[in-house]
Amino acid sequence: MSDVDPKPMADAIRILTIDACERVGEGHWGTPLGAAEIATALFTRHLRFNPADPTWFDRDRFVQSNGHGSMLLYALLYLTGYAHMPLSALKSFREIGSICQGHPERAPEAGIEITTGMLGQGIANAAGMALAEAYLNHLLGPEIVDHHTYALVGDGCLQEGVAHEVISLAGHLRLGKLIWLWDDNQIQDDGDVAQATSEDMDARFRAAGWHVQRVDRHDIEAVSAAIAAAKGDPRPSLIACRTVIGSGMPGLEGARSAHSCRLTRENTDAARARLGWQGGPFAVPQDILDAWRRAGRRAEAEHAAWTERVASLPEERRALVARLQEGRLPEGWRESLRAYAREAAGRSEFGIFFSGEIVERLAAAIPELLSGAPDLEAATKHKRSLVAFTAENRGGRYIHYGVREHAMGAMLNGMVAHGGVLPIGVTYLVFADYERPTFRLAAMMGLPTVFVFSHDSIGIGRNGPTHQPVEILASLRAIPNMHVFRPADGVEAAEAWELALARRTGPSCLIFPRQKLGPVRASATAGENLSARGAYVLAEASGGARRATLLATGTEVAIALAARARLEAAGVATAVVSMPCWELFEEQDEAYRNAVLRPETVRVAVEAAVRLGWDRYVGPEGSFVGMSGFGTTGPEEALYRHFGITPEAVVREVRARL
């Protein structure tokens, strides 16, 4: 605890916030002013962190879920002494190239744990971090991993649908080291929260198994005491802090306009006078800055003791900690997958079950792998020999998310951002839209999150068009920096998994059918991954110079091969190109792409989805065999015939263009 009055320490956050917003002419300043005491209590008395080692493995995590109030976080990081958050960064708030973006963007070296983006994502990210901590605490022991995850939460976060999902699941799993600090200012962009919300929020959390406390006004001592009580309770905690938005800004505090109205120099001068603040823009008195810097050094002794404990571990355990901290996979994981590819060659299996077999093999080699699905274990088979992660068993490696796809996706990102674990989430492709914010933010952050999907087309049959995701492949491929894999058989499944796990700069989606995948690759050679270039010639023309090129993914590769056989028998030299990952194919040089696509040939693409995106590969004279609208109910084989996704249809398209 500092010997400086904490009130002016909180006011330093206010001053830096209003100066940054006034300088740029915009910004959401109301939340930082209202939550300044909450943040001061947390960062000066409870949060365990070390700006000299920002990525300390056993640091507490802080997530600003209400990210529009980002200047609160930036001010805290500057005040506590993060080298990557100098005062000059705050002066460039909301400018191109600044680390101080309008909403926080992940920069662990500067203390920004995660890009929270849209409201609600951050609270689920925080739950994922708390889950990762609970598992690692079991795996490595409390002497190596034992920390809390805090989130600053606004009214909007709690109104989002994902909030209901994650409140329920976190309470069920008793994630006791998860603490949410609710900035309960009862104001949002449209005005009074009562216009849209009337439930008893405290009762809502208690009903879900949370520890709930309420703190009045801007009382630093009361907030600190509540945090201490939360840390001692085995349940996840909500601390409802009744605040005033824009506190300290004369004429605007408590008003709707305090959310984000434009500030003038007259406003900032009035705030300085109200707070008794000396100095010009961005000036923090030395005694107050020194007190904040001491707060930033508060955990130095704990950090040093932790470092000594790690150094004294037996060599094998010390190596494991180092590997997990660095995000490296164990030796032999790649060889395990390639061995599986050789075993899967020539074998038929339900597509998603190939992935389930692969995950079971990976889990045996990778102790940090955590699997899970939203009430779809029987349909996707990604649990197998794994046992459930529960409130009673923190060593379980399968998470039963319940029907909570949105929470699952955001929690996966939180786990990956936390580090030390390799989580995967499995669901039907039609539910991908519930995870879309997660994909987008993972891609933006460059997080290597792995998403697995099943039931990928009209091939699911009688469940009908509501569950036949004809448009979703195209929408996933539209997301920058995300790799979308649609393997054609067990060999390509193993190759896709290898590529997804090896990738460290962005997320991957692995997409499988419910129906069986027959073998399209008769063998898999050791050390060979044909999918690594995104697309490759699976079967070259054998009847002379190539005249036609058939392009396909997933289940439709087999249809293309059947069409090729008929065309070749009729004297049309035809090649089949499997395209498991468009994004990797786009990374290849022009010579390779042309050698695969052969632009001078007739090109026909085959995919049980909409055409969007295929024209870049088939060209202006090419054709597409697939879906042009939604599906319908019927047996899978009949549906393929009904919609004309057949070898005969492919042959007709080729002949029409020769």
Model regions and ranges:
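A short glycine/serine-rich beta->alpha loop
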Residues: 3-4, 20-29, 57-65, 109-120, ...
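A glycine-rich helix N-cap at a beta->alpha junction
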Residues: 82-92, 170-183, 206-210, 442-457, ...
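Non-catalytic terminal/interface segments that mediate subunit docking, oligomerization
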Residues: 308-448, 526-537, 551-554, 568, ...
